[in-house]
A protein has these predicted regions:
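Metal-dependent amide/peptide-bond hydrolase catalytic core
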Residues: 1-202
Length: 202
C-alpha cells in the first residue's frame, strides 16, 4: 500500500530488521562457546546481503536477507536456526497477521557443511607432513567441504597454497614460492600413489 497508509500494511523490511536484531543477539551466545585452537576462538554469525522494497513511498511487501553461521566442531548451528524460527513464529507472525492474514516468514538453507577438526597425529597427517616437508599443522576460520568427508569416515586434512589474508579482495594472489611448494607436495603425493601399497611410512 501507499506509505500514506503505512499502518494498513505490513512493512516487510521492518520485520526483517527485527529478525536481524534477533540474530545479533543469538550471535552473542554463539561467541560464548570458545575453543582456543581456532582464530577467532568462537563461531561467528553475520548477515551478508539484504533486499527489499520497491519505492520510498510504498510499504515494502517483501524483504529477504542471507545470513551465515560459521560454527566450531562439536557445536550445533541448529540451536541458532531453531531459536530464530521460534522467534519468527511466536513473536513476529502473530503481529504481522493481525494486519495482513496472508503474511508469512520463510527460511531456506542454501548450503551446509560441518566444521572440521583433524588429528595432527594421525597416520594420514604424518604422510602429509612428509609430502609437504612441514608438520606445522594449524586451524583456519574459513569453511571447506572437508567436514563432509570427515563425517563420511574419510581421513581429511586441508592443505594448499595461499592465505585468506590475500583472499576475497581486489588483486587476490598466491605467491610463486607457495605455488612451487604446492607443486612439490603434489609430486610427492603422486609418487606415493604410484608406489607399492605395502610400503611403510618412512
Amino acid at each position: 500500500c501507499h506509505s500514506a497508509y503505512a499502518p494498513e500494511g505490513v512493512n516487510a523490511i521492518s520485520y526483517a530488521a527485527r529478525l536481524i536484531s534477533r540474530l545479533d543477539a543469538l550471535g552473542e551466545s554463539v561467541a560464548q562457546q570458545q575453543d582456543s585452537r581456532f582464530s577467532p576462538p568462537s563461531g561467528t554469525l553475520q548477515v551478508g546481503t539484504i533486499h527489499g522494497g520497491a519505492a520510498l513511498n510504498i510499504v515494502p511487501q517483501s524483504c529477504w536477507f542471507d545470513f551465515e553461521i560459521r560454527y566450531l566442531p562439536g557445536t550445533r548451528p541448529q540451536a541458532v536456526t531453531d531459536a530464530l524460527g521460534d522467534y519468527a513464529r511466536e513473536q513476529l507472525l502473530p503481529a504481522m497477521r493481525k494486519v495482513a492474514q496472508r503474511s508469512d516468514i520463510h527460511f531456506q538453507t542454501l548450503s551446509h557443511y560441518p566444521g572440521l577438526l583433524s588429528d595432527p597425529q594421525s597416520e594420514f597427517a604424518r604422510w602429509l607432513a612428509q609430502w609437504c616437508g612441514s608438520d606445522d599443522f594449524t586451524t583456519v576460520a574459513y569453511g571447506t567441504e572437508g567436514g563432509l568427508f570427515d563425517e563420511a569416515g574419510v581421513a581429511t586434512l586441508i592443505c594448499g597454497p595461499g592465505s585468506m589474508a590475500q583472499g576475497h579482495k581486489a588483486d587476490e594472489y598466491i605467491s610463486i614460492p607457495q605455488t612451487e611448494r604446492c607443486m612439490a607436495m603434489l609430486e610427492n603425493l603422486c609418487a606415493w600413489m604410484r608406489a607399492d601399497p605395502s610400503d611403510s611410512l618412512r
